[in-house]
Amino acid sequence: MATLSLPLPHLTQAIPARARPRPRPLRGIPARLLSCRAAMAVAPDKEEAAAVALDKAVKVAVAAPDRAAVAAVGVGEELPEGYDQMMPAVEEARRRRAGVLLHPTSLRGPHGIGDLGDEAVAFLAWLRDAGCTLWQVLPLVPPGRKSGEDGSPYSGQDANCGNTLLISLEELVKDGLLMENELPDPLDMEYVEFDTVANLKEPLIAKAAERLLLSRGELRTQYDCFKKNPNISGWLEDAALFAAIDRSIDALSWYEWPEPLKNRHLRALEDIYQKQKDFIEIFMAQQFLFQRQWQRIRKYAKKLGISIMGDMPIYVGYHSADVWANRKSFLLDKNGFPTFVSGVPPDAFSETGQLWNSPLYDWKAMEAGGFEWWIKRINRALDLYDEFRIDHFRGLAGFWAVPSESKVALVGSWRAGPRNAFFDALFKAVGRINIIAEDLGVITEDVVDLRKSIEAPGMAVLQFAFGGGSDNPHLPHNHEFDQVVYTGTHDNDTVIGWWQTLPEEEKQTVFKYLPEANRTEISWALITAALSSVARTSMVTMQDILGLDSSARMNTPATQKGNWRWRMPSSVSFDSLSPEAAKLKELLGLYNRL
């Protein structure tokens, strides 16, 4: 029996040549380089020359083999050359990421409200410098202007229109639609005063729209194409007609309009169009100007590698073009008045529940119509955002129905939503889309099942984490990869404000769970906790980055005054926030979110 003579005879001396195992390659060195290793072992006196040869050989790139080729290799057979180069790639859907929640109205802006001009561009550049790849905004619809709505982006008059108060006057000057000397003096207000801003900006935006309509250049051609866009036409005309009627009739809602207009008689609508043709055209041109500026921001964000996450309220306001033009899709009586309205029972945001008063959908009628209204709405959202959150996602599994005559949300009952039939129709029409499910509040098993069936991430909020026991789903050790974790949402207090009113027992839990809370600002302790979470996506609010108290809170649910008004302090510029950007980027790198 033949034996081998190697430098380690005590290991190999008795091994037959035929049964001798193949030399195992060094980690990262292809099998074809084994001759180099053998040369070093057999001829120690030539180790230096062999090492040089090995170094040269290692530098030769070997492409990883095709997966199919590897799969075809039988058990025990030799794998293709380059097999050890088949390193698993990180799928984009598995890449960890982080972003900032900041509604555009909260940017500084020169005219009392944030806009889509230089400050929005500066914010995107700051996000890039901070290593963030997400900008989350609230709904971009025109905010509610009636009593009690107080600028709410969740009470808009149309689900598809853009908020024209966000239009930058300075960008209109660049487009040649306004003159420099027509711009008003800067309006530096600590908080947004929506009526004041509207009185200042709306006449100038209307003037710019009128000049656009009178022009014959490239911009006018773009406007004509905008109106023909299938994602725009239809809802745009309904919204313009609705606005024209609304301005001409002093009524609380369309329910009080004269019967021919209330019920959309063709002759009545034609009469309104002829009488208010100029207003209607200007209205539509303003929507084009919003779209033009927003797409400019989206294009710049994409250039920087930043995705924009939108927000879609599940319900729409009763006094809206959506309900007026699509009555059969809502639970209304024969006169057009809601039979039931939306709300939620008591939850973490409100001890008495919340009465939203939006009309509920007639899901049976919608399903019979192929969910056409919703498909159009989703297509519009995809025109504005890279991904979006569906607010009150649980309403698609089961919704809280409150009789319209009730004054409190406690008087209600649960009713079944459209469930998978809705998403089956949606995905068939538009394909798979990036949806985030807002699954806060009363979350039952069917809501979880629905969310997982469409592979939509849910949410966790750290401000909810420290009450209750160790099984609290908002505690970081209970997070899941398929989640978006927040320090707080627009409905929460700032972290500083939350901390100032947190019961002492819960504070002690925070100190035990987050030891760094003893050594740093509490807002940054929660930011760190959010970024270190196993959740794929982490979102922090700009208020928490700035370490602001309750005076910077965006919204207090179940209240009607003082909400949606916060703006970044006038003393702060994005240039001055370089230290915060560096601090955030360091944390993102530490937790693999760059």
Swiss-Prot record:
What does the record give under GO molecular function? 4-alpha-glucanotransferase activity
First and last residues of the transit peptide: 1-37
Q: Could you confirm whether the keyword Iron appears in this record?
A: no
The family database entries (Pfam families) matched by this protein are listed as: Glyco_hydro_77
* SUPFAM superfamilies in UniProt: (Trans)glycosidases (SSF51445)
GO biological process terms, alphabetically, are: glucose metabolic process; maltose catabolic process; starch catabolic process
Of which family is this protein a member?
Answer: Belongs to the disproportionating enzyme family.
Spell out the protein name for this chain. 4-alpha-glucanotransferase DPE1, chloroplastic/amyloplastic
Tell me what organism the protein belongs to. Oryza sativa subsp. japonica
